[in-house]
Amino acid sequence: MSQKTLFKIQYINLCIDEFARKFRLTPQVAHNYLSRYKGLEFLNEHYDYEHTQALWQTQDALRTICQRNGGTL
């Protein structure tokens, strides 16, 4: 596994944990929510840009993406 792939995995895990904390969810529920409403797909596709942004900006982007795809948080 490449170093970039490992960094991407760590970053996505961090985003899931922070999303869970922000919305008072368990990490498992946050993962399921982000998966269902395309937040994880967004992070995977836009990792190169998103990991350079402040974490709060990424969290706001995730919330917006999920809401556009039917999420209600």
Model-found features: residue ranges?
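Short hydrophobic/aromatic-rich motifs at helix boundaries and adjacent loops
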Residues: 1-3, 33-34
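N-terminal acidic leader/helix
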Residues: 2-28
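N-terminal, charged low-complexity regulatory/assembly segments
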Residues: 12-15, 43-44, 62-65
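Alpha-helical structural motif
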Residues: 12-15, 26, 39, 54, ...
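Amphipathic, hydrophobic secondary-structure cores in small proteins
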Residues: 20-22, 26-52
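Long, compositionally biased
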Residues: 48-73
